[in-house]
From Swiss-Prot:
Organism, scientific name: Drosophila melanogaster
Source organism phylogeny: Eukaryota, Metazoa, Ecdysozoa, Arthropoda, Hexapoda
The protein's name in its UniProt record: Carnosine N-methyltransferase unmet
Reaction it catalyzes: carnosine + S-adenosyl-L-methionine = anserine + S-adenosyl-L-homocysteine + H(+)
Keywords: Methyltransferase, Phosphoprotein, S-adenosyl-L-methionine, Transferase
InterPro entries: CARME, SAM-dependent_MTases_sf
Amino acid sequence: MSSMDCATFPMHPKMDEQLARTFVINEEEEEKHIQKVQNAFLYYGPYACQRLKRSMDYLNSLSGEDQIMLAKYRGHLECVRTCIDRNQAVIREILRGRVLYPTDEATGDPSEFDEPPPNVRHGDMDQIDIPFDEADVEPLKILKAQSTLKLIARDWSTEGALEREQSYKPIIDSIVAYFKHSDFELKDIKILVPGAGLGRLTYELACLGYSCEGNEFSYFMLIASNFVLNLCDNENKYVLYPWVHQYVNNLRREDQVAPVRFPDVCPLKNPPKGHFEIAAGDFLEVYKTPNAYNCVATCFFIDCANNVIDFIRTIYKILVPGGIWVNLGPLLYHFSDVSGQNSIEPAFEDLCIIMESVGFVIEKSRTGIRTKYAQNPSSMKQSEYQSLFWVCRKPDLFEEQRGKRKASREPHDLIVREDSEEEGEQQPERNETEEKQQLKPLATANCETEIKEQPS
């Protein structure tokens, strides 16, 4: 497919009339926030080089004998500097595509991203020791820019395939099993992916033929995903060094400067079968229409709420009767112990009570799903979650009227560890006729669309 044939994927603010008015009122404030995110990307290089300079300065202060023994280490630090510069060059490419919404006008001269920030001479280590004005750039936001590079590796490189297999495959498999292409017109199955991040899970589901909408609030994610989805025109065109900021737990020098190519799949040249879009906005603010989606898929998302009950209620509301919610992830609870933020941190057994109280039927649940998140595969320190996985169903109207909802169970009855299943154990199959009846309003039977296999 030539570049002229490439599709583009809509990325827009999801809003109703009331929210649109608020959006206009807050547009100036929103632009200031975007500017801070942009500044964090622009100051990525100087900030990373400040850390590098500390190591280099200390190395230069050592005795001549010590420096002789560290000659290869010095060469490695120079290589680190080169990798930081190359990362910054990719970031400038990402920022050239900062316009997220079709209605936006170009934001200034693209060449503004060709040069380092003021007071920094590119390639001159001595000029990196500059003050960071938190009015322009916050160190915490620069760390988020670093994390964004790691997430590009997780979602859009061959090196991230294992993590995607751990996190996305259970979700995809459950959706495919529930919405079989032999029973439904897949293009009529509407799936929402809140917390879509860089969009890979949403893209993979759309490739199977489903109508998929991702939702994301973070401008770090939106800017980067817009670049991958709408501006990358070839596989593995760009090279990042996502682990260059990790100075510890390196077995070999090369592990810190290992390159990662992206994207491993070019969405422009491989457009999905089903409808695919990314909507920007706060999940709780913009998704209020009842009975709108056949499926909600969440991955590493529900613990991003101050009050997880708000997320669960909203998911229940927007699902059609008979629709399902598939979730995988830990309970990190991002606002726990954050100054100025309120937070509740229910355990899984509490979540089971909440889900059933809201009205969900818990069809399947597992614990102990081993999942890593943006980990350097060569690091001596490997962190992983024992994640939760569940499939919940919103009862159809017939069930609610007849009171056929499943009997209440004790929370501990729902806690089944992944490694406790015997090999080959079969799970009870759902009644397929009942499944079709539940989703009949938004799904037409006998779809001829073939399901594309999930990349391994």
